[in-house]
Amino acid sequence: MTKHNGKYYFQYGAPGTEFKVYADGVYVSDSPLGPFTYQQHNPMSYKPGGFVQGVGHSGTFQDLKGNYWHVGTCMLSLKYKFERRIGLYPTAFDPDGVMYSTTAFGDYPCWNADYDIKNPSDRFTGWMLLSYEKPVKVSSTDSIYSSSNLTDENMRTYWAAKTGEPGEWIEIDLGAMKHIKAIQLNYYDHKSVQHNRANDLYYQYRIYSSDNGTDWTLAVDKSDNDKDVPHDYIELGETLDARYLKLENIHVPSGNFCLSEFRVFGFADGEKPLPVRNFKVARDKQDKRNAMISWNPSSDAYGYNIYYGIAPEKLYNCITVNGADHYDFRGLDLGTTYYFAIEALNESGRSALSKVVKQ
């Protein structure tokens, strides 16, 4: 329950903990004991697309600057159906008292609570994904756990080396010189036998950069790390210009050297994508809760953000789609009119938002 401007916002986790559409809804009342009314904008926290999916079982709090945040559990469900990760998303109340959580670019680098930013959508740094579907070389591969899984933007697939020994490595080719601002290493467990806590529950590694794939320079040194950070995010102090990155294993707690994703963020030289053309939304005549969303693919885009909401100026929810030109959407309410828009994403930035479509 969150109290804001005299109203009480009762939040709850909807069914579907084990699915990517797991979300939180909200009811609103003038009294803490009700009666409560279903908020027309629902779910209030929703993330069915992108690298990290799902945001339910959540809680809302304020930071020291008064900004609201929604911390929720995100679907993984790979080793076990209720396997989760934790996501943190900026949250706000609009002038009409509508509570919403911004999950657009929620799995990209964003400005944290140290930055006094009132509009949740302004927390995105603008650093684009540089690693999507880029070619990867590895020191070894265990069974079916292919190196292509390292750059597919899917947290539920992973690559594993044959061992967890020092010297196992990953090399990624970004295709051209890129301006790198941050790196995220998403470790995973493969053939791990560790139970409970241990003194060596941490990852140690080095990252090297290169212009030509032959001559390497040390870029990140975590050889003495002693913190348990399985989704390690490294924000570089200065922009790193490089084409190749190489990750060298030094220590894993148990099992094989294994990652679900090697993510790189920053900028590429070039133009931002053009606005998306032929954006269409068709609600199912038999079941208005469903809609088929389609568009013409942009030749220079790797992904798209679909925004929707209950008014043209309230497009608060976002669905990220990579490498596709359609989305089968099954998350609408009966009896509610919705508005949709889309933007294209490439390594140089974001396109202008499309015209808003009413359905």
Regions of interest found by a model, annotated:
Residues 329-350:
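Beta-strand-rich modules
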Residues 208-209, 298-319, 323:
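Extracellular low-complexity, O-glycosylation-prone stalks/linkers
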Residues 25, 203, 230-233, 323-328:
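Short S/T/G- and acidic-enriched coil/turn segments that sit immediately N-terminal to beta-strands
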Residues 27-50, 96-104, 218-221:
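Blade-edge beta-strand/turn elements of extracellular beta-propeller
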Residues 289-301:
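Conserved aromatic anchor
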Residues 19-27, 79-88:
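Structural motif
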Residues 152-220, 230-277, 286, 296, ...:
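Aromatic, loop-rich ligand-recognition surfaces of beta-strand-rich domains
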Residues 1-16, 67-76:
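Hydrophobic core segments of beta-strands in well-ordered, beta-rich domains
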